[in-house]
Structures are given as C-alpha cells and as structure tokens.
Amino acid sequence: VYKVLTVETPEGIVVDGMLQPTQEYADHLVNALGTNGIRTKKVLFTISSTRVASREVQIPNVKASKIEALVKTNASDYFPVDLTQYEIGHYLAGGLAENGKLRVMALAVPKALLNSYYQLAQMCGWEIECFDYSSNSLYQILRDEKSEKVTMVIKIDENSTIVTVLSAGKVLLQRTVAYGVQDAIDTMIASGAYAVNDPMSAVERFQKKTCLN
C-alpha cells in the first residue's frame, strides 16, 4: 500500500454497496485523488454488500484453472435464485477439507450491483481491472497468520459485519451479519448523549472514546 485516502461520500451515493453516482461526485473523487498524487486509470473495486450471497462449498480437488468452470456449473445448486441476474465468483477458503475436497467460497453478485460500479468508472474515466469481495480481501490479509490458535477477526463495515474464524491460516468459519457501523452512528446521534449531530462527528467520537455501556 503506497497511498491511502478517505473521501467523504454524500448521503445516497452508496446504499448497501450499490452506487448511485452523479457526475459531480465522480469529478470530486477524481480531483481528490489527483490532489493527493493518485492518478491511475486502472482500478479494483472491493465490494461490501448484503446483496452478495456467499456459500462455502466443497468440490473435487481439481487444477486451479478448472475451479471457475466447476463452480459456475453447479451454481444453481448453491444459490436458488434466477442466475441470469447474477455473476458467479469464488475464492479458495483455505486448503482441503478432511475428505480431500477443496474448500471454496462461492459468490453470487447481482449484475445491477456490478453495473453501478461500471457506471462510476465510466464517469471517472477509469478502467476496471477486476472486482473483489470484502471477505476475500480480509482473508488475503489474514491467511499468512500461521498461529495454531483459533482466532476470531471482526471487520465492521457500514451496513454489515464480517466475522472470520481462522486457525493456521485456514478459514474455519466466515459469516456476514447485517449490522454495521451505521447502526452505531444512528444510535449515537439519536441518543443525544454524545453531543454529535452528523455521521463524521460520531465516527470521530467513538474513535477517541469508549461509547458502550
């Protein structure tokens, strides 16, 4: 990681991972990145959304080049939805199961969700290299942890929380809970106990002070 930048996003631009971009926001985003020396045209989006369905499955221990086709072939067994409205993806969930099969996390991502990112990329003049899912991004960071101890990692996003349980670099359990930091922000503002009236002030407050009773 060479540079990190946080750009405040107006209300309504992102709703549970789905983008509703405006040209004004796209221009603001490009200008903010450029001001901070980030001018690349190739981007990778990491998506966090409760609209994405995920399921751990076990498949025969085939070559890496054949996993995608195998997952897509069996997608209708994993996800009882109209698959014409979804893109199917996957990532390895950490080695082999006890029966010798590969542990794979299969994903079903709404095409409408992906299209909203293509829309933003077009507005910004970017080329999308690929998409990633937040739970996989988290696993890529954690998989080098070789501790034999069972460890729980909790990643809190805006509207959801990812709970990952690992041991020796392997995922034992991963679940997404439909509650995130926005719930805490709304509660802080509504309570009137913390003298905050907007989301950014609420975030700054609970970064500096324990706000749980």
Write out the residue ranges for each language-model feature.
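Gly/Thr-rich phosphate-binding beta-strand-loop-beta motif of the actin/hexokinase/Hsp70
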Residues: 1-8, 43-46, 142-173, 177-183, ...
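Non-catalytic, solvent-exposed interaction/assembly segments
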Residues: 1-74, 115, 149
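Short, glycine- and charge-enriched coil/turn segments that flank and shape catalytic ligand pockets
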Residues: 16-24, 95-101, 143-149, 196-197
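Helical mechanochemical/support elements of P-loop NTPase systems and associated helical scaffolds
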Residues: 21, 25, 67, 71, ...
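Short glycine-/small-residue-rich flexible loop motifs, especially phosphate/cofactor-binding loops
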Residues: 30, 118, 185-186
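Conserved, well-folded catalytic cores of nucleic-acid-processing
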Residues: 32-35, 77-82, 123-124, 191, ...
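Active-site neighborhood for divalent-cation/phosphate handling
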Residues: 42, 46-145
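Phosphate-binding glycine-rich/basic clefts of nucleotide- and phosphate-handling proteins
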Residues: 171-213
